[in-house]
């Protein structure tokens, strides 16, 4: 069973999921990290960027992610084109994960799903959205040295009802709420998660 975890930049998705992986031992995967792996020389993502955007965006080791990001983030049509070109890679990866976790729970952080709901939703059994107070989000993004307004526009607002977990307190508290939801799934007839640990 695959559970998608979505939310805008700065809400703490990665931190919460890493906490869940470390302390509750759920398998956790990150779509962004998968794409970054695909950007290595010799991988499909590297070839796509080089062929479709030009050799100036790659070096002998990998895609120059910083240069590519500066280019596509300032041109929405090009960002959409990049997303559409890499989408089949992500979908094939999700197919593999879905086959691997038919009777166990795994979580996948995939924020871009909110932009391409119909393309990614069929791969997941459930969806969890992480939200956070706007002031905390801005502080988190500024600490990362990114353009707050630009980054917040990258991910669309949800257009469908999604279970939402608020991350305004501690990472542990947010992770607890998520794992309580996962526990309810594990206890249902949908799947069996052999290594689940009940939050204390």
Curated annotation (Swiss-Prot):
Pathway stated in the Swiss-Prot or TrEMBL entry: Cofactor biosynthesis; coenzyme A biosynthesis; CoA from (R)-pantothenate: step 5/5
Pfam family, one: CoaE
Cellular compartments annotated: Cytoplasm
E.C. designation(s): 2.7.1.24
Top-level division of the source organism's lineage: Bacteria
DPCK domain segment(s): 2-200
Record keyword Magnesium present: no
UniProt xrefs under PROSITE patterns: DPCK
InterPro entries associated with the record: Depp_CoAkinase (IPR001977), P-loop_NTPase (IPR027417)
Record-level GO cellular component terms: cytoplasm
Family: Belongs to the CoaE family.
Protein name: Dephospho-CoA kinase
Organism: Mycoplasma pneumoniae (strain ATCC 29342 / M129 / Subtype 1)
Top-level taxonomy: Bacteria, Bacillati, Mycoplasmatota, Mycoplasmoidales, Mycoplasmoidaceae
């Amino acid at each position: 069973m695959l559970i998608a975890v979505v939310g805008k930049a700065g809400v703490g998705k990665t931190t919460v999921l890493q906490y869940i992986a470390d302390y509750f031992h759920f398998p956790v995967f990150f779509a962004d990290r998968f794409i970054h792996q695909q950007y290595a020389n010799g991988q499909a993502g590297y070839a796509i960027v080089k062929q479709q955007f030009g050799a100036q965006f790659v070096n002998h080791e990998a895609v120059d992610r910083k240069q590519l990001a500066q280019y596509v983030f300032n041109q929405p049509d090009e960002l959409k084109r990049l997303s559409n070109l890499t989408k089949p890679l992500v979908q094939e990866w999700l197919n593999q994960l879905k086959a691997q976790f038919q009777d166990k729970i795994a979580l996948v952080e995939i924020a871009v799903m909110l932009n391409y709901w119909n393309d990614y939703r069929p791969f997941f059994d459930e969806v969890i959205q992480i939200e956070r107070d706007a002031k905390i989000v801005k502080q988190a993004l500024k600490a990362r040295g990114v353009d707050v307004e630009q980054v917040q526009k990258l991910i669309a607002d949800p257009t469908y009802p999604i279970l939402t977990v608020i991350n305004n307190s501690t990472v542990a508290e947010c992770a607890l709420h998520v794992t309580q939801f996962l526990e309810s799934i594990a206890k249902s007839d949908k799947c069996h998660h052999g290594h689940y640990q009940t939050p204390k």
